[in-house]
Amino acid sequence: MSQTPSSLRDLEHHSAFVERHIGPNDAEIAQMLDVVGHACLDALTDAIVPGNIKSPAPLALPEAITEEEALAKIRAIADKNTVFRNFIGQGYYGTHTPKVILRNILENPAWYTAYTPYQAEISQGRMEALINFQTLCADLTGMQIANASLLDEATAAAEAMTLAKRSAKSRSNTFFVHDAVHPQTLELLRTRAEPLDIVLRVGTPEEALQAECFGVLLQYPDSFGHIGDHAALADAVHAQGGLVAVATDLLALTLIAAPGEWGADIVVGNSQRFGVPFGFGGPHAAFMACRDAYKRSMPGRLIGVSIDAAGNPAYRLTLQTREQHIRREKATSNICTAQVLLAVMASMYAVYHGPDGLTRIARRTHRLAAILAAALRSAGVTVGERFFDTLHVKAIDANAIHARARAAGINLRAIDSEAVGISLDETSTRADVVALAALFGAQADVDALDAATADALPQGLLRTTPFLTHPVFNTHHSEHELLRYMRSLADKDLAMDRTMIPLGSCTMKLNATAEMIPVTWPEFGAIHPLAPAEQSAGYAQLIDELEAMLVECTGYDAVSLQPNSGAQGEYAGLLAIRAYHRSRGEAHRDICLIPESAHGTNPASAQMCGMTVVVTKCDANGNVDVDDIRAKAEKYSDRLAALMITYPSTHGVFEEDVVAICEAVHAHGGQVYTDGANMNALVGVAKPGKWGSDVSHLNLHKTFCIPHGGGGPGVGPCAVKSHLAPYLPKTLGGEGDVGMVSAASYGSASILPISWMYVTMMGSAGLRKATQVALLNANYIAKRLAPHYKTLYTGRNGLVAHECILDVRPLEKTSGIGAEDIAKRLIDFGFHAPTLSFPVAGTLMVEPTESESQHELDRFIDAMIQIREEIRAIEDGRLDREDNPLKHAPHTATQVSASEWTHAYPRELAAFPLPSLKQQKYWPPVARVDNVYGDKNVMCACIPVDAYKEDVEA
């Protein structure tokens, strides 16, 4: 049989990546379309998406290219960055990422594809790593409790300010800020304070002694390196009912007294120098630690210790009632995504080095700084006296010094025309000291100076208390030991390297390896965020091109990539709306309409902008109630600032009236904010900027393939129409009407290559097909499960968008089995649960994404059908209403292999509810975790070893 010769163009197959990213092949797509009753993807799309919002033309983006072609293109971009030796400091320091951590955490999908650990039983490994992080931060700061990461140090400082405002006895509205905090921290404080009517006063610690304030923020050591003694100031602030917040450096705290020892109430900082590269500003894991009295007002996630159903220690997210997904506008913060992956890296860095290793790194860094200071003084140069790693070099011609430094491939901190800063770090060498001294005309005989030079640490502030005494920080110091420890933790968890994660509103899609590769290139990782612009030309091109891609995908006119989470993107968008109204003399507009189905970050972000939240209703079909929006827009016409909606809705449908809703809000002077959480249902199909929306945030860690990392990092770009463009966040040192919302001008810049790679490899047609298959996969699940579970809401033609809500509330009435029981039973089948009880209590929201194959969808469907059969057995009396596999799920290997089995159902049903599980089975490390016990007995540090010993002995 002869074959028709293929052309070279046919064989080149530039769209190969599209077929790798999209799970179902064309044959499977045809079968699935047949199940949902549509002839092709375009027909299905037409049946789902309202005609008045559909894009009339394809995305004006290039065609798809191969992985190899895309990697070559981004390599050329990366090569435009120039890597200098960086001594800039200002909160960012050189560090060596241990290769065992680089390969087995940062480059390991078992870690980077996991989701936030809401389902405790399948997140024990990740939560152990995070509780190590919390212990690290609490120990070094001298605090009683620490959280599981914040977005960056400056954001953490702003959160410390609002925590102090909530918690202080003082009725003052003034917050005093040390004039030697990092400049980016001061910028963030100004952004956060203004909408909340908090008065910032900036000055010296001595001036703070005379200030009436609800709190102070001190930098320790300060931004210029000086280590101050602030004990008297802390006493004075406490005497007037205020709180003391401190921004600090974890490495320095191995040598100098912990802030908690001299009166701090709240301590924040950045863990970046614990093994995480500069990355042009991020992502890095910040932290907050505080006294136990303030734990219930503390922002961010907290990992705590509880017990499971067998009485064994188990980790869980604790005190969640503080958070935005529960308390909404009354939450302590709008924080959702944080920096879990980077916190895990920092915690493993501490585990690997241990207290002795960290102290050695700190001592070596300090010795190099002290030797350099001595060399400079010998040449008549003025240098600060009490420092850890940073020298404030004064009375010089700074421009001349910078010119010499640049010629030598060195970056120093620019302070003013007569001063520079020099920060040493783990990567600094003897040769660096010699080269740095030479810039000032000094000679450095390192050994001679070392012998003759005393430390520059203040004797009255030396650390005397032990830290990191738990065995986990004193055991895994060989590479084999750490490798096996990290593997043991990863094996406890479910991530996307094992299974689909069908979380609604979370878009857990493929994070392709080719997309991830550029992240670890030094051309991206080794660029300091404050390096001269000519050294970051590659980043400038990458940012410009990615912004243009996002503008095209959304229909807006301008984008800021600064927000480093979706919640920060919301905040930036609402600040833009607020500033726009003020520019028009309408500062009184402060009402934000938000549907009752909205994500919890929406009202929390509105509150942070000083807006008053007014909740609007949803109708019986799950749509936002258009009449209620019109009525409330009219009622609050003079004060209406904005409407926040999610589209498609959080109920999983394309609402027909979105254009009319936008028109109604605009008619009363308001702006429309469209939450971009569900943008994966829109790319290549519809553009919010074209149907009347004024601003959106996007989630690059959802729609555009940045991995979730177990709870961060993320990027939440803010996209706006042209009239709001002047009110996007400014850059550090730049001009603008709205301040910064992240510490770095371009946020988590080093992970932007992931989204650039995704768009470049998918191309215009591939992005549209991805959206269409996401719609298909969700409708396929809804259709196949229809005989077993009701889909709560559907849109036009009885179809859903990219996710569906399964209503299991009727089953609870007939069997006593609720959504949580089903979620836990899915663990026995090797699945992460869908989103539980959001946006409707007692339901499960399923979002499969386009990356899941028909085989994986069918595996999930089979599990859900089997669970329905188990529920039916309860309804029929064949299984006991209390003693059944759903009520006792998940089942551990220890339980099902125990010599005694006390349940009324067989072990095989518990462990292997489907035959396929006998070939491949995930065993949860703990049984169902007791949430009530965990909140009543809050413990957020490493578990004592004897707790495990008791478990073994039992």
Swiss-Prot record:
Q: Give the sites modified to N6-(pyridoxal phosphate)lysine.
A: 702
Q: Which InterPro entries match?
A: GcvP (IPR003437), GDC-P_C (IPR049316), GDC-P_N (IPR049315), GDC_P (IPR020581), PyrdxlP-dep_Trfase (IPR015424), PyrdxlP-dep_Trfase_major (IPR015421), PyrdxlP-dep_Trfase_small (IPR015422)
Gene Ontology biological-process annotations: glycine decarboxylation via glycine cleavage system
Subunit field text: The glycine cleavage system is composed of four proteins: P, T, L and H.
Q: What is the annotated role of this protein in its UniProt record?
A: The glycine cleavage system catalyzes the degradation of glycine. The P protein binds the alpha-amino group of glycine through its pyridoxal phosphate cofactor; CO(2) is released and the remaining methylamine moiety is then transferred to the lipoamide cofactor of the H protein.
Keyword entries, A-Z: Oxidoreductase, Pyridoxal phosphate
Instruction: Show the GO cellular component annotation of the record.
Output: cytosol; glycine cleavage complex
Cite the Pfam families for this sequence.
Answer: GcvP2_C (PF21478), GDC-P (PF02347)
Q: What's the cofactor?
A: pyridoxal 5'-phosphate
| Coiled coil spans | none
- Catalysis performed (reactions): N(6)-[(R)-lipoyl]-L-lysyl-[glycine-cleavage complex H protein] + glycine + H(+) = N(6)-[(R)-S(8)-aminomethyldihydrolipoyl]-L-lysyl-[glycine-cleavage complex H protein] + CO2
Q: Which family does it belong to?
A: Belongs to the GcvP family.
Instruction: State what protein this is by name.
Output: Glycine dehydrogenase (decarboxylating)
What molecular function terms (GO) are annotated for this protein? glycine binding; glycine dehydrogenase (decarboxylating) activity; pyridoxal phosphate binding
> EC number(s) in its UniProt entry?
1.4.4.2
Highest taxon in the source lineage: Bacteria
